[in-house]
């Protein structure tokens, strides 16, 4: 599942960059910029759907990766496991910032 995580992460970064090119964070124009992306940008609706569903797939792959690590006893490797926990917490914080704050 590690390679799927890499593919999901690259897809999220690329689609996020494409969406950020057309998004306006102003309180009055935010909704209209999302509507603009879906209606006027070539394949904007597809890019938006790939980005939203890719986030869910990314977290499913993370949970499968963690589950595989627990099943195989990788938590016994303290340093590796702690780095993974830190990366997981940073991913959760980034997802929270990207979902709640805009």
From Swiss-Prot:
One of its GO terms (cellular component) is mitochondrial inner membrane. GO terms for biological process: mitochondrial electron transport, ubiquinol to cytochrome c. Gene3D superfamilies: Cytochrome Bc1 Complex, Chain C. The chain crosses the membrane at residues 1-21, 45-66, 81-101. Keywords: Electron transport, Heme, Iron, Membrane, Metal-binding, Mitochondrion, Mitochondrion inner membrane, Respiratory chain, Transmembrane, Transmembrane helix, Transport, Ubiquinone. GO terms for molecular function: metal ion binding; ubiquinol-cytochrome-c reductase activity. It is a multi-pass membrane protein. Binds 2 heme b groups non-covalently. Its main location: mitochondrion. PROSITE patterns: CYTB_NTER. Pfam families: Cytochrome_B. InterPro entries: Cyt_b/b6_N, Cytb/b6-like_sf, Di-haem_cyt_TM. It is found in: Mitochondrion inner membrane. Heme b b566 binds at residue 65. The cytochrome bc1 complex contains 3 respiratory subunits (MT-CYB, CYC1 and UQCRFS1), 2 core proteins (UQCRC1 and UQCRC2) and probably 6 low-molecular weight proteins. Component of the ubiquinol-cytochrome c reductase complex (complex III or cytochrome b-c1 complex) that is part of the mitochondrial respiratory chain. The b-c1 complex mediates electron transfer from ubiquinol to cytochrome c. Contributes to the generation of a proton gradient across the mitochondrial membrane that is then used for ATP synthesis. Belongs to the cytochrome b family. Heme 1 (or BL or b562) is low-potential and absorbs at about 562 nm, and heme 2 (or BH or b566) is high-potential and absorbs at about 566 nm. This is Cytochrome b.
